Amino acid sequence: MKSFLLIALVLFFLFVSYASAKNKCQLPSDVGKGKASFTRYYYNEEGGKCETFIYGGVGGNSNNFLTKEDCCRECAQGSC
């Protein structure tokens, strides 16, 4: 019984983690409110690939990655 609960708990957290990543990748790019000019990557769901945008440094959303590789790993499902 304990092992069943442990497996169920692990599966639940995997599902929540996957759903969270999926939702993150569906968000539009968001430059934020800062005045900086950092090149970042976001997943463009329409184009099905990671693209660059200029991030202001403050705020924004979670569809914001330091590298294209990070963006591809989280969102592109192997085709990037």
UniProtKB/Swiss-Prot annotation:
Q: What is the effect of changing residue 33 to A?
A: 1.8-fold decrease in trypsin inhibitory activity
Q: Which GO terms describe its molecular function?
A: potassium channel regulator activity; serine-type endopeptidase inhibitor activity; toxin activity
Disulfide bond residue pairs: 25-75, 50-71, 72-80
Give site residues, Key residue that directly interacts with the S1 pocket of trypsin: 35
Recorded consequence of changing residue 34 to F? 1.6-fold decrease in trypsin inhibitory activity
Q: Which Pfam families match?
A: Kunitz_BPTI (PF00014)
InterPro entries tied to this protein? Kunitz_BPTI (IPR002223), Kunitz_BPTI_sf (IPR036880), TFPI/VKTCI-like (IPR050098)
User: Which SUPFAM superfamilies is this protein grouped with?
Assistant: BPTI-like
Identify the keywords attached in UniProt to this record, alphabetized: Disulfide bond, Protease inhibitor, Secreted, Serine protease inhibitor, Signal
Pinpoint the BPTI/Kunitz inhibitor domain residues: 25-75
> Where does the secretion signal sit in this chain?
1-21
Annotated tissue distribution:
Expressed by the venom gland.
Q: Name one GO cellular component term.
A: host cell membrane
Query: What are the subcellular locations of this protein?
Result: Secreted
UniProt record, GO biological process: envenomation resulting in negative regulation of voltage-gated potassium channel activity in another organism
Q: Does the keyword Signal apply?
A: yes
UniProt record similarity statement:
Belongs to the venom Kunitz-type family. Scorpion delta-Ktx subfamily. Delta-Ktx 2 sub-subfamily.
Additional info? Negative results: has no effect on chymotrypsin and elastase. Shows weak inhibitory activity on mKv1.3/KCNA3 potassium channel currents (1 uM inhibits 50% of currents).
Q: What is this protein for, i.e. what is its function?
A: Serine protease inhibitor that inhibits trypsin at a molar ratio of 1:1 (Ki=160 nM). Is thermostable.
Q: What is this protein called?
A: Kunitz-type serine protease inhibitor LmKTT-1b
Organism annotation: Lychas mucronatus (Chinese swimming scorpion)
